[in-house]
Amino acid sequence: MDLYAVWGNPIVQSKSPLIQNKLATQTHQTIEYIAKLGDLDAFEQQLLAFFEEGAKGCNITSPFKERAYQLADEYSQRAKLAEACNTLKKLDDGKLYADNTDGIGLVTDLERLNWLRPNQRVLILGAGGATKGVLLPLLQAQQNIVLANRTFLKAKELAERFQPYGNIQAASMDSIPLQTYDVVINATSAGLSGGTAPVDAEILKLGSAFYDMQYTKGTDTPFIALCKSLGLTNISDGFGMLVAQAAHSFHLWRGVMPNFVAVYEQLK
């Protein structure tokens, strides 16, 4: 039986084994998919041993996406630009191929919500690792992006890296252009840490739809709670993105594209 896993630290909270096994059942693929706790000091040795023992592929979650990318021999364009991967596949020649399905997972979920049309204005809050993985697929979907970050320089550097691929501009959190936004995407992990919003409420009120790349089971994320408290509508957490990126990883490994919406509906 072909072996796959998700690697992270911590990992006990991961929904990936549940999701991937549902995708396998739906597509009549026989696989074993497990969760593996990565050692912060010995992750590289663990991962290489995992593949040497015959594993076919894996997902990578926090905090190992950049380190896993460094171990790969070949890369997709979206992994290369993100300098991080969430998916590794062992090729027939034994080489490791890195992909990043986070962004295409986000785009696929925005399509499910009917929130994705060409030439929209999208505001992304946060310029960290989560954002790096999603910018290329959003730009390829012809979205016009304002990338806002507390540290302007970080947003500026990221925007400049992706400018050859579409329309993207940087802003600091307190200088976001006052214009309407078709979608506001929260890519900050902090949410409302310390009770402070990632962005001024008046900016949020310029949005039409609100997407949090985070999700918490059974309760609202801080960003979603903030949106609701402002009376905003068209709000979604990132669980659909999680299922969709898993489906795209599965497709890379198995050559079969699952119906991610059916699995999302089962698990939500």
Swiss-Prot record:
The active site is at residue 65. GO terms for biological process: amino acid biosynthetic process; aromatic amino acid family biosynthetic process; chorismate biosynthetic process; shikimate metabolic process. It is an enzyme of class 1 (oxidoreductase). Shikimate binds at residues 14-16, 61, 86, 102, 215. Pfam families: SDH_C, Shikimate_DH, Shikimate_dh_N. Involved in the biosynthesis of the chorismate, which leads to the biosynthesis of aromatic amino acids. Catalyzes the reversible NADPH linked reduction of 3-dehydroshikimate (DHSA) to yield shikimate (SA). Belongs to the shikimate dehydrogenase family. This is Shikimate dehydrogenase (NADP(+)). It comes from Haemophilus influenzae (strain PittGG).
